[in-house]
C-alpha cells in the first residue's frame, strides 16, 4: 500500500535539497530566457496527479488498453480547447515536446532526402528547422533562408530560393527573431511551387492566443507549438491544422503514434488542458499584451544606452543584443549577468564571428518577468541594470550592487505569492 504522506524530503534529502535550491533560484533571480516561463499551480497539480499511472496508447475512443474512459475525457478536453483557442479544426495534444511535434510533421509529409526551406539558425531559426547538427538537417536536404540588412526576413530571397530549389516544404517560425512574420506571404510562396507550409509557432503561441501576434493557423498547412514558453503551460508539444483535410490529419496522428511515440503522458496532457483553459481567460490577454509592451520598453532603454539591438526593435516577446561593438562575447555577458542574479542566454547574432559556444550576443525575453508582475517601469529599471553590468563587466562592485537591487525587486514581486 502506498501512503499519501510519503514525501521526497523525508526519503531523499539530496534530491530534495537540489529541488528546494531551484525554488529559491527561481524566486531570487530575474528570468529573461525567452523560452522560459512560470506555469501555474493548477498545471503543476495536474502534472503531479495519478494520471501519470495510466497508459493510454492510441487516441480518445480508440485505445489499445482498457480503463481509458476518464483519460479520454481529459485528452478530449485538451483537444477541444486547443482547436477553440487557435481556430483550428484538428489538434493532436500528445507530442512530448515541440521537437517531437516537428518530427511528426516531417515524418507524415516528407521522405528522407526531400528538400525543405528553413530559417537559418544563425539568423534566428531553430535546430529542428534543418540545422546540420540536428536530425532534421541530416535526413533532409536543407536550404536556409535568412534576414536582410535591416534584420527582417527577406521574402524576396525566400521566393527565389523556393523557385530555384523547389522544396517540398517551407518551414516558418523561429527561436530568436523579433519581427512579425508574414504568414500569408509565406503561404503565397509555398503555393507558387506546390509546397507545404509548416509553421512552428512555439515562441509566440501565447501572444497568438491573445491576438497580440498574427495567427498562422489560417495560412499554414500544419502548425506546431510547444505548450510552455509564452503559452505558460507544461513542457510539451501540440500539432494544429485547419482546412478539413482528413487524410492529412490521419497522417499526422499516425506519425505521432505509433510513428514516433508510444503511450502519451496523460498527466502532462491534463496540464495542457488546464493551461489552454487559462489562455482563454481575459487576464491572459492582458498578460500577453504586457509581455509585448515590456519587450519594447527594454529595447528603448538599450538603444538609449548605445547598445545594438538586432533589427533595432521588437514586435514580440524577445530581442537580441549584438555585443560585437562592445567587444564582449555572449558567454561573458551571460556569466556576468548570472552573478547579478539576472538569467539570460548567450546567442549567436547575424554574421557572428564567434562560435555557437561563445557567441557575440545575448537573447532577452520578457514572458517570465512579466508573469511575476513586472510592467514597463520595472523592466526599464532592469534594462538599465543590465547595461550597468555590461558596461562594467569586470567590476564586481557594480555586479554586487545590481544583484542587491535584483533581490529587492524579486522580494517585491514573488513568482508564487
Swiss-Prot record:
Main localization (coarse): cytoplasm
Amino-acid biosynthesis in keyword set: yes
InterPro entries listed in its UniProt record: PyrdxlP-dep_Trfase, PyrdxlP-dep_Trfase_major, PyrdxlP-dep_Trfase_small, Ser_HO-MeTrfase, Ser_HO-MeTrfase-like, Ser_HO-MeTrfase_PLP_BS, SHMT-like_dom
PROSITE patterns: SHMT
GO biological process, one term: tetrahydrofolate interconversion
Reaction(s) catalysed by this chain's protein: (6R)-5,10-methylene-5,6,7,8-tetrahydrofolate + glycine + H2O = (6S)-5,6,7,8-tetrahydrofolate + L-serine
Residues that, per the record, bind (6S)-5,6,7,8-tetrahydrofolate: 121, 125-127, 355-357
Pathway: One-carbon metabolism; tetrahydrofolate interconversion; Amino-acid biosynthesis; glycine biosynthesis; glycine from L-serine: step 1/1
Residues the record marks as site: Plays an important role in substrate specificity: 228
One term under GO cellular component: cytosol
Modification N6-(pyridoxal phosphate)lysine, positions: 229
Record's keyword annotation contains rRNA processing: no
E.C. number: 2.1.2.1
Subcellular location: Cytoplasm
Known cofactor(s): pyridoxal 5'-phosphate
GO molecular function: glycine hydroxymethyltransferase activity; pyridoxal phosphate binding
Subunit structure of this chain's protein: Homodimer.
Functional note: Catalyzes the reversible interconversion of serine and glycine with tetrahydrofolate (THF) serving as the one-carbon carrier. This reaction serves as the major source of one-carbon groups required for the biosynthesis of purines, thymidylate, methionine, and other important biomolecules. Also exhibits THF-independent aldolase activity toward beta-hydroxyamino acids, producing glycine and aldehydes, via a retro-aldol mechanism.
Entry-linked PANTHER family: SERINE HYDROXYMETHYLTRANSFERASE
Protein name: Serine hydroxymethyltransferase 1
Organism: Pectobacterium atrosepticum (strain SCRI 1043 / ATCC BAA-672)
Gene from which this protein is expressed: glyA1
Amino acid at each position: 500500500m502506498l501512503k499519501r504522506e510519503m514525501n521526497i524530503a523525508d526519503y531523499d534529502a539530496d534530491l530534495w535539497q537540489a529541488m528546494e535550491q531551484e525554488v529559491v533560484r527561481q524566486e531570487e533571480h530575474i528570468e529573461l530566457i525567452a523560452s522560459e516561463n512560470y506555469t501555474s499551480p493548477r498545471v503543476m497539480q495536474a502534472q503531479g496527479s495519478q494520471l501519470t499511472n495510466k497508459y493510454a496508447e492510441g487516441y480518445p475512443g480508440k485505445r489499445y488498453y482498457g480503463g481509458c474512459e476518464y483519460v479520454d475525457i481529459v485528452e478530449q478536453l485538451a483537444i477541444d480547447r486547443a482547436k477553440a483557442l487557435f481556430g483550428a479544426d484538428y489538434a493532436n495534444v500528445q507530442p512530448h515536446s515541440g521537437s517531437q511535434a516537428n518530427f511528426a510533421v516531417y515524418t507524415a509529409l516528407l521522405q528522407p532526402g526531400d528538400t525543405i526551406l528553413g530559417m537559418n539558425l544563425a539568423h534566428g531559426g531553430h535546430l529542428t528547422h534543418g540545422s546540420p547538427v540536428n536530425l532534421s538537417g541530416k535526413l533532409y536536404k536543407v536550404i536556409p533562408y535568412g534576414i536582410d540588412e535591416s534584420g527582417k526576413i527577406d521574402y524576396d530571397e525566400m521566393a527565389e530560393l523556393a523557385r530555384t530549389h523547389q522544396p517540398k516544404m517551407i518551414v516558418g517560425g523561429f527561436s530568436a527573431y523579433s519581427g512579425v512574420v508574414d504568414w500569408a506571404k509565406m503561404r503565397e510562396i509555398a503555393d507558387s511551387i506546390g509546397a507545404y507550409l509548416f509553421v512552428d509557432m512555439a515562441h509566440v503561441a501565447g501572444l497568438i492566443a491573445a491576438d497580440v501576434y498574427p495567427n498562422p493557423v489560417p495560412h499554414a498547412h500544419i502548425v506546431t507549438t510547444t505548450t510552455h514558453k509564452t503559452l505558460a503551460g507544461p513542457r510539451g508539444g501540440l500539432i494544429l491544422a485547419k482546412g478539413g483535410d482528413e487524410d492529412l490529419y490521419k497522417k499526422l496522428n499516425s506519425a505521432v503514434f505509433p510513428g514516433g511515440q508510444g503511450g502519451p503522458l496523460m498527466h502532462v496532457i491534463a496540464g495542457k488542458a488546464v493551461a489552454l483553459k487559462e489562455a482563454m481567460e481575459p487576464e491572459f490577454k492582458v498578460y500577453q499584451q504586457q509581455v509585448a509592451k515590456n519587450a519594447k520598453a527594454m529595447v528603448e532603454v538599450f538603444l538609449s544606452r548605445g547598445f545594438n539591438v538586432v533589427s533595432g526593435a521588437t514586435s514580440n516577446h524577445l530581442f537580441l543584443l549584438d555585443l560585437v561593438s562592445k567587444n564582449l562575447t555572449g558567454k561573458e555577458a551571460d556569466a556576468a549577468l548570472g552573478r547579478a542574479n539576472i538569467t539570460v542566454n548567450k546567442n549567436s547574432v547575424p554574421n557572428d564571428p564567434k562560435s555557437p559556444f561563445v557567441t557575440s550576443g545575448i537573447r532577452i525575453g520578457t514572458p517570465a518577468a512579466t508573469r511575476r508582475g513586472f510592467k514597463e517601469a520595472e523592466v526599464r529599471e532592469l534594462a538599465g541594470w543590465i547595461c550597468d553590468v555590461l558596461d562594467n563587466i569586470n567590476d564586481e562592485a557594480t555586479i554586487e550592487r545590481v544583484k542587491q537591487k535584483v533581490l529587492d525587486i524579486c522580494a517585491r514581486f514573488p513568482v508564487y505569492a
